Amino acid sequence: MTLAGANQSEIPRPVAFARNAARYAGLLFDYFTQYAKVQLGYRGDFIVSLITSFAATIFGLAFVLILFRKAPQLAGWNLPEELFLYGFSLIPYGVFNILAGNLYNFGNDYIIEGKFDRILLRPISSLFQILFETFRIEAVQGIATGLFCMWWGAHRLHVAWTFEKLALLIFFGICASVIYLSIFLILTTASFWFEDRIGIHPPVWNVIAFGRYPLSIYSGAVQFVLCWIIPFGLASFYPSVRLLGRAVVPEYAPFVPVVAAVFLAIAISLWNFGTRHYSSTGS
């Protein structure tokens, strides 16, 4: 039997995977194209959003600079090292903001308003639609600012950017982004059972700031939470330590991809469970 006449179950898995990957890549391009058209129609709003986003990033950096004017070191970290850590933390934060803004308002926009029914009617992954129906391109400035802070800190510390170190930067950046996405996806799934317009995202969102500083400034209990419960600290601190070549005890950098994989698996499992048990609001 030819491939064209074969049943879907008879198609080799690599071929089926390639077809699905190509299909979703095309859908992603379509989503982004549609988003770009909308933004071109509202350029003023986009510029205001970009300025507002950039101002928030600069405000956070200004706080760090003021802090180090008062104290030249923070738990043994100087300003260039802290800016490197701060800059790295902005990368997964920016990636999350670009791709997953819908998660923050999922309970209100999709569950309470009933838009999730429309999502489920389409023969496309519901999670894919939620993640990529909208983008926040203005959040790219956060990634750019983070890379600049890392470059400046590395330059002042005379850090040599070898191919291995660049590969580690990309690898840890992806892992950290997955951790951020997974944490908020886990929180988002609570909306399937507890209908609330605001949800539980805001207090956890504020915890992100704790991962932008050396974990050694916190108590052991707080460090545990930031590494294993809400691992924003693990996602930012230990990759920065590895990239800077600093020695810390314990060394948890090897656990970053493990935690990313575990949290992603939990998040996807909860999402699938939630969609299977979803009851329409009837809106």
Indicate residue ranges for each PLM-predicted region.
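Hydrophobic transmembrane alpha-helices and immediately adjacent juxtamembrane helices
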Residues: 2-283
